[in-house]
Regions:
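Polybasic low-complexity intrinsically disordered regions
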Residues: 102-268
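Catalytic-loop motifs flanking and including active-site residues across diverse enzymes
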Residues: 55-58, 101, 213-216, 377, ...
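Basic, short loop/linker segments at the boundary and entry of helix-turn-helix/winged-helix-like folds
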Residues: 17, 21-66, 101
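Charged, often Cys/His-bearing segments associated with DNA-binding zinc-finger transcription factors
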Residues: 1-39, 421-450
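Short amphipathic alpha-helical "interface-anchor" segments enriched in bulky aromatics
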Residues: 79, 272-312, 351-397
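Short, positively charged, Gly/Tyr-enriched micro-motifs
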Residues: 49-120, 395, 400-403
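Long, low-complexity, polar/charged, intrinsically disordered or flexibly structured peripheral segments
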Residues: 315-360
Length: 450
């Protein structure tokens, strides 16, 4: 890979459409699959070994790395490309596996205990990156996307622990609640937790197409926390699908700042009196938790958003100040509100009143909007899975095969992310190739050539 020095650490736009043999070799070397291959060999036992499990596993990974739309296309290239064959342990053209061998291998890979070990490969790769990249996982975002799949024609035992493909439907509405767009698919839902800055997946989970996002997020978050150093996650952005009281309590217990827009549930009310204030107070809040003060001295009451000062973690309160004093303009109610106060009127809102309504980062702040825009990172990751690596092609039949295939795609995602971070950087057109400190550390951990 040729990556310029000015590119970010994970330069996804520098991915090669057709990776070189050197890139494929380094990718295969970066995948910690010893335990998985050992389990597969033990499962095979003394049976026929015409196509070793290492060859089948390497063929699966290479088919995704080289972006073949079908397995037959990858097998055809292996038959023609002797150099590529040798990378995965195939000496002759006759030793290239057949399409049905790969289909059976996917079925085995998606069964226990191999499926858990496959997920363990992903977890180890995340931990390696998290130990080397100090800010990986600090600012995160989550989302779910639909993936097309096909169901087996005949029922069989062994898939009871896996969700089966089902019909999914998602409606998009405008501000008035009218449906503007409907997306339907048959298959599964893929739930991701992604680092916003680096666009690297930290944890994932496959569920039924009609599963609710707020039901799946706790398990995805727990897996991400295991993969990252303690207290690494600072904030988590999600759409309204996770605007749930239980989710806010979960994030509060983990000391993670939620960046989640709230659902509109008030029918006729526009504002309410802040709890703890009576009818003589001029402090109110809207459904999103934005705090306002009323100027009651003017002929007609005028509502002003109060100035957000910060989150007081020790007190578990959100501090607001008189907007006129904070921003330097004159308010007719200054004498009434701020008499004898140099700093101006101060309001502290206890978050425990309603964790969902009053998050540590109020929704009306620029910081909230900036962090909420980080959700686009998940959409870009979803696009790579679907368009670049073909996870949404719908060519995989059966729950076991689908889970194995998606797990392999995620391993390819992390493997190529690791190579991007470990790639030498080019200083200008005629400049030398240099390794940064993170690249040196990664290459040393993976045993790659310095």
């Amino acid at each position: 890979m040729r990556v310029a020095m000015t590119k970010p650490l994970f330069a996804w736009d520098c991915l090669e459409d057709s990776p070189s043999l050197g890139t494929v070799r380094e990718f295969l070397q970066s995948v910690p699959d010893e335990a998985l291959l050992g389990s597969l060999r033990a499962w095979r036992g003394k049976g026929r070994d015409d196509y070793p499990v290492g060859v089948l596993w390497g063929t699966l990974l290479v088919s995704i790395v080289l972006r073949h739309p079908t397995m037959e296309g990858c097998l055809g290239e292996l038959g023609r490309n002797a150099g590529l064959r040798r990378l995965i342990g195939i000496e002759t053209e006759e030793q290239v596996p057949k399409a049905w061998n790969m289909s059976r291998f996917l079925d085995v890979l998606g069964s226990e205990p191999h499926r858990t070990l496959l997920e363990g490969v992903f977890d180890r790769m995340v931990r390696t990156l998290a130990e080397t990249v100090p800010d990986l996982g600090r600012v995160t975002a989550g989302d779910a996307t639909g993936l097309r799949a096909r169901r087996l024609r005949a029922k069989r035992g062994g898939d009871e622990d896996l969700p089966v493909p089902a019909g999914g439907r998602k409606e998009y509405t405008d501000d008035e609640g009218k449906v503007t767009k409907v997306v339907e698919w048959f298959g599964y839902k893929l739930h991701l937790l992604v680092d916003v800055k680096h666009e690297v997946v930290l944890a994932w989970r496959i569920s039924s197409a009609n599963a609710a996002d707020n039901d799946e997020l706790p398990e995805v978050l727990a897996r991400a926390q295991k993969n990252l150093p303690k207290d690494r996650i600072d904030s988590l952005a999600y759409d309204k699908a996770c605007d749930d009281g239980a989710i806010h309590e979960l994030l509060d217990d983990a000391d993670i700042k939620p960046v989640i827009h709230n659902r509109s549930m008030w029918k006729d009310e526009l504002e309410r009196m802040l709890p703890g204030h009576d009818g003589r107070s001029n402090i109110v809040h809207d459904e999103a938790g934005t705090v306002y003060c009323y100027d009651k001295v003017s002929r007609e009451p005028v509502r002003h958003p109060m100035a957000y000062i910060g989150h007081e973690q020790a007190r578990r309160t959100i501090k607001y100040r008189c907007p006129a004093r904070h921003e330097g303009w004159t308010c007719p109610s200054d004498q009434r509100c701020n008499a004898g106060k140099t700093y101006g009127k101060t309001v502290r809102v206890p978050r425990d009143i309603d964790l969902r309504r009053f998050p540590p980062i109020p929704r009306a702040t620029k910081k909230f909007e900036r962090l909420y825009k980080g959700r686009t990172a998940v959409e870009r990751v979803n696009a790579r899975f679907k368009v670049f690596w073909g996870a949404d092609d719908g060519n995989v039949v059966g729950a076991r095969r689908f889970h194995a295939h998606v797990g392999a795609v995620l391993i390819v995602h992390l493997g190529l992310a690791t190579l991007l971070a470990a790639a030498p950087r080019r200083e200008g057109t005629l400049g030398k190739m240099r390794l940064g400190p993170i690249a040196k550390a990664l290459r040393a951990k993976l045993g790659l050539k310095q």
